[in-house]
Amino acid sequence: MIITIGGLAGTGTSTTAKTLSQEINIPFISAGDVFRQMAVENNMTLLEFSEFAEGNDNIDKALDKRQAEIANNSENLIVEGRISAFFVNADYRIWLKAPDNVRAERISYREDKSLDTVKQEIAERTASERKRYMEIHDIDIDNLDIYDLIINTDTFNIESTVNIIKKCIENKK
């Protein structure tokens, strides 16, 4: 079974993917893992590769292609990434969401930054990603039609979120 888990920064995609992976004993990869692997392959630090990727659409395309290839060569895998659902032939596509203020609080705590700074960064990052995904892939990240399940992670804690996903997977047609 191939499962994708996507969501904007601070919605809990990494935590959910890791926890689900442990509970159902299916490995997971994240877009971040693949990005770090690509940095190593290009003999760059993560920062150098990030800066290189900013001006090079081919990096985004290669990252998406790599995730799809890994998933296509796997029988069971959880793929975590903002737009992985659009590139991976998944059995189940999940989108996690949370209000902007909740996302900002989570990131502020995780990264030990001021809430105001994080709110500004989230606004800029979301606008940048929205524009980039549309320009590079013709993907509107606000259109959630591709997803089988959408969960508000402000409403449910991690345990409940994972339980909802497990129940839905068990009952999928």
UniProtKB/Swiss-Prot annotation:
- The answer to whether keyword Iron-sulfur applies is no
**Reactions catalysed, as given in the entry:** CMP + ATP = CDP + ADP; dCMP + ATP = dCDP + ADP
Give the GO biological process terms. Answer: pyrimidine nucleotide metabolic process
Q: Which domain of life is it from?
A: Archaea
Segments forming a coiled coil = none
Gene Ontology CC annotations of this record: cytoplasm
**What SUPFAM superfamilies would the database entry show?**
P-loop containing nucleoside triphosphate hydrolases
- CDD domains named among the record's database cross-references: CMPK (cd02020)
Which positions, given as ranges, span the membrane?
A: none
Belongs to which family? Answer: Belongs to the cytidylate kinase family. Type 2 subfamily.
**UniProt name for this protein:** Cytidylate kinase
Q: Which organism is it from?
A: Methanosphaera stadtmanae (strain ATCC 43021 / DSM 3091 / JCM 11832 / MCB-3)
**Gene that codes for this?**
cmk
